[in-house]
Structures are given as C-alpha cells and as structure tokens.
Design a protein with these regions (language model features):
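Solvent-exposed, non-membrane alpha-helical residues enriched in polar/charged side chains
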Residues: 69, 73, 115, 168, ...
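N-terminal Rossmann-like NAD(P)+-binding domain of SDR-like oxidoreductases, especially those catalyzing
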Residues: 1-186
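A glycine/serine/threonine-rich, flexible loop-to-helix segment
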Residues: 138-141, 193-203
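C-terminal substrate-binding subdomain of Rossmann-fold SDR/epimerase-dehydratase oxidoreductases
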Residues: 19, 205-322
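Residues in well-ordered alpha-helical elements
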Residues: 66, 78, 90, 97, ...
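Hydrophobic alpha-helix immediately C-terminal to the catalytic Tyr-X-X-X-Lys motif of short-chain
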Residues: 162, 166, 170, 200, ...
C-alpha cells in the first residue's frame, strides 16, 4: 500500500515509517526539513536534514493547505497516518496559538485535502489523546470511548477535541474513513527527557539528590512505544470497516500515581536519594486521573499491549543507563 505518514521526525514517526517500509509499503511524508521535539533514533542525522531511506519527501508546512493538498494529490495514498503534532500539554498553556495551529489546523488541512484530492483513501488514522477525557467522575473509570462527554482541561486538550469532532463530522457527512486513537501517555523515548517517565529516569541515573518533580498525586495510564507502534501498523493494515469513524483507546490500562511511578523507577535505577515534589507550578486545571479501558482496541483491532508498564520501564531505563 501507499501510506502517507506525517511526523516522521518525531518520537514514533521514524520507527513507524521504517517498520511500514519493512512490511513492503510505499511511504511518503511532509516535512519542513527541520527536526523538532523527540526523535526515536538517529537524532543528529534528522537535524542535519538527512532522510529515511525509502521515504518520499514533500517539503512544506502542515498549516499551509495548498502545500498539503498538492502533496496528497501527487502521492495518492491508500492510508494516511497523521502523527505530526505539538505534543507537550505544559507547552500548550504558554503557546496556545501555536498549539492550535499545529494540532487543529494541521488536522483540518490534512483531512480536508485528503477528502477532496484522494478519492480512494481507505483510512485516515489520527493521534488523539487521553487528555480529551479531562476530568471525569470516579465512577467513569476506566473510561470507555463511547459513553462519556469529553472535557478539555488544557489548550492541548481543546485542540485535540476540536480535531476529533471535525473528523467525526467528516465521517458522518461524507463517509470520510477516519480512525481516532486516544493514546495514553507514551514513553520509551531515547533522545528526550522532557516527558515524565524519561525525566524521572534521567534525573535518577544522574545520582543527584534531590531530584525535582511536579505534583505526585495525579494518576495516569501509559503506553510503551513498541506497543503503540503495533497499534498503528495494525490499523494501517486492517481491512475491517468496523474501525472507521471510531475512537479507540490505546493504553496498557495500568493506572499509577506519579508518586508510585517514581518509586518504581527508583527501584529499577537503584536511586536512594530525595525527591522534591511540587517543584513546578501546577496546571491551571489539573486532571486528577486518566485511566482508560482498552477492550475496544482488543475487539476491533485485535490489539493488546505486549509489555506491562513495569516491563516497559525496565527496557526504557536500561537504554538510558547504557
């Protein structure tokens, strides 16, 4: 198949593109030729503008509709996997317009250009987020996809909900073949320690005391990068029409507080120092709990995580401790 993947300079995108190529698919992407954020591998080469072997490159910005439209019209993909996004919730509080431009306008441009220019598109797979659930009553956990109102608790969440609503509108109005993944907090990064698990590991292996962390009380679900990658590959290669128009939780469904998460990582890294909690300002609207049910992914995709949270933590820590 011909698969258009955005975000190939990101945490998941490069490895996903390489995996799909190894499966015999033809891959294209849109890039500004400047890597930003996290890279799963080969960071320096991506910054220098070197390319992934076997990927066809179109150059431009996702926020430029004409650039997006021309690329999709030329490539005519069977499947689009839209990963490109500004991924930091914290960043969204201080850079609202940038986050909305990338995380909503980028989705609008990709999907509308695909609807108009790619008549034989089979699937448009988009990365939503657990953040879309926001603050829910305790009895709602673990949250399922179809029986809850979404509540944004950050500018990031607002943009994600807007994007999902737009895609679902296209599906209902025009039969647009979208698939929405509501992803748990992902981890397994090899070149960035700006997210919670990698930050804790990085600080602990430095051996300094105290390490500085934020609020210890929020409870979160996580998903290990190889398991998240599997979900995208399975959705891309699926022939099932049941997944079209659906939102699907991608998570290990192993909720853990940040305090307990840090304690688990301390065991793995043999850290015995102090943790200085609440070292950073709290979010304007903190979500106390994000815990999702993954039964729909098992039922519709045949997907389930191959790694427990603890197994993923051990593998990630082992990489950083090399």
């Amino acid at each position: 198949m011909k698969i258009f993947v955005t975000g190939v300079t990101g945490f998941l995108g490069q490895e996903l593109a390489e995996t799909l190529i190894s499966h015999g698919h033809e891959i294209a992407t849109l890039t500004r030729n400047v890597a930003r954020g996290d890279r799963a591998t080969n960071t320096e080469s991506m910054i220098k503008g070197e390319t992934i072997s076997g990927v066809r490159y179109y150059f431009g910005d996702l926020t430029d509709y004409l650039v997006v439209s021309d690329a999709l019209k030329d490539f005519q993909p069977d499947v689009i996997i839209h990963l490109a996004a500004q991924t930091s919730v914290a960043y969204s509080f201080t850079h609202m317009k940038e986050v909305f431009d990338v995380n909503f306008i980028g989705v609008f441009n990709m999907s509308e250009a695909a609807r108009r220019e790619v008549p034989n598109l089979k699937r448009f797979i988009w990365s939503g987020s657990a953040e879309e659930y926001g603050i829910q009553p305790e009895e709602a956990y673990p949250t399922k996809e179809d029986d809850l109102q979404l509540h944004a608790a950050s500018p990031y969440g607002v943009a994600k909900i807007a994007s999902e609503n737009w895609l679902k509108y296209l599906n209902l109005a025009y039969g647009f073949p979208c698939v929405v993944f509501r992803n748990a907090n992902s981890f397994g990064r090899k070149h960035s320690h700006q997210f919670v698990i990698e930050s804790i590991i990085f600080q602990m292996i430095q051996g300094k005391s105290p390490i500085k962390l934020g609020d210890p009380e929020p409870i979160r679900d996580f998903i290990f990068e190889p398991d998240l990658l599997d979900a995208y590959v399975m959705a891309a290669e699926s022939n099932s029409s049941e997944i079209l128009g659906e939102a699907i939780n991608i998570t290990t469904s192993e909720p853990i507080s940040i305090r307990d998460l840090a304690a688990e990582i301390a065991k793995i890294t043999n850290y015995h120092g102090e943790i200085q909690w609440n070292s950073f300002p709290k979010r304007a609207l903190e979500i106390p709990k994000l815990n999702m049910d993954n039964s729909k992914a098992k039922r519709l995709l045949g997907w389930e995580p191959k790694h427990t949270l603890k197994e993923g933590l051990n593998i990630t820590a082992s990489y950083w401790m090399k």
